[in-house]
Amino acid sequence: AYTEMALYARVNESGELELINHLGIDLGNTAEEILTRLQKQDYETGQVTTQTTQLASDNRYAHDVKQVDADSPARFNADPTRLYEASGSAGKVCVFAVRLDTFEKVESKVFYIGSNDHDDLTAIRRYLLTSLPSLPIAGEYIHRDAFSIGAKYGKDTFLFIERFGTVNIPRALALKDRIDGWLEKIKIRGLTDQILQAITFFLPNHLPRRMLAFHQRFEHHLILRVDEQSAEQTQQFLNEYFAVHSTGSYFACTEEEGRKAFLHRFAVAGAAIRYRDTHRAEVEDIVALDIALRRNDREWVEKIPADLEQHMLHKLYYGHFFCH
């Protein structure tokens, strides 16, 4: 997320550590006072600046992401036009707080798309970014293999969030880390992961039937959310597209299916770690690559040389699909 409003520490040109407050909130003068008041949320509405020339989001993003024939990414950390103090700092400063724009939540519709030809998803992406009255809200890609690993090894994450919400994840992870720390002192490693996997193995299936059916039929999956203003046009396009392209299909999600589809995408992201931690005898480690595609890339399915692929147990592909 891009912002020009941040509170961060840096080492300046003279080699001195300094705290920079560009939050637009009057928190005092000294570093100790600023950080203490921020942590305690000790400030009034009148101390928060709302009229400012500083941006709290990227006001060019909606335009840039629509340029589907451009030969550069629309979203990547090394973009020199989107480097500003804390934004894009890549760990070179210590960020304590940022201010970001918020947007009104609108009524929306979720579509689940599957295909055995990645060209289908490319064509859909290009149409949705250039022809709808408003940009899609979200588009998440999951490959069949990532779907499988996520369904099995992200199940506890899925069920925990569904029951307790994302707000409680940090507390749960902190508790798990403490238990793991105690167990490692007596040379027991990965026991909590094994127990969680064993428990979830006996629990009922958590994913909607139509998603599971698409998992069996299709290699490539796209979870699409659009606002109500764009829903009818989106559905009409998908109907017409798949009427002449037999390599894929789609369905309009119920509210529950849409919620579970995006929750599954969230769980997929951490499932590889669980797989590693429960297969330490076979898995040396994970190589995680975050790749920014050019907006005009049509051949985005990775082809790994056989001499490298033979050393890989699994290749898991997932990501944000519209912001190449």
Language-model features: locations:
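C-terminal substrate-recognition/cap domain of FAD-linked oxidoreductases
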Residues: R99-T102, Y112-H324
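FAD-binding subdomain of flavoenzyme oxidoreductases
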Residues: A1-D119
